Amino acid sequence: MSKQKIRIRLKAFDYKLIDQSAAEIVDTAKRTGAIVKGPVPLPTRMKRFDILRSPHVNKTSRDQFEIRTHQRLMDIVDPTDKTVDALMKLDLPAGVDVEIKLQ
C-alpha cells in the first residue's frame, strides 16, 4: 500500500465529539507507524430556521433555530496494513459521520 493516501472527513453537530474522535484516529494511526496530517478544521456550516411563534396573528414574532455542522479533515500518508486494520476496528461515537477515501 505504498504511495497511497487515506483521506478521512468527519462531520458532527457536537464539536467536542468530533475533536475526541479525531484524536482517537490520530492516536491509532501514529501507533501503527503512519504519518498523519491534520486534523484540519473546515468551515462550520450553519442552517438557520425562522418559525412563527403564534399560529394565528403576530407575524413579526418569530423563533430562530440553527443547526451547526462541524467538520474535520485528516490525511494518513503511506498507511500500512496494520493502520488500515486498526482504523477498521476503531469504535467511534454514533454522532460522528465518517467518510473515508483512498487516493
Swiss-Prot record:
GO MF assignments: structural constituent of ribosome; tRNA binding
SUPFAM superfamilies according to UniProt: Ribosomal protein S10
Keywords recorded for this protein, A-Z: Ribonucleoprotein, Ribosomal protein
Swiss-Prot/TrEMBL GO biological process terms: translation
Superkingdom to which the source organism belongs: Bacteria
Pfam families attached to this UniProt entry: Ribosomal_S10 (PF00338)
GO CC annotations, alphabetized: ribonucleoprotein complex; ribosome
Function: Involved in the binding of tRNA to the ribosomes.
HAMAP family, alphabetized: Ribosomal_uS10
Assembly information from the UniProt record: Part of the 30S ribosomal subunit.
Family: Belongs to the universal ribosomal protein uS10 family.
Record protein name field: Small ribosomal subunit protein uS10
Gene: rpsJ
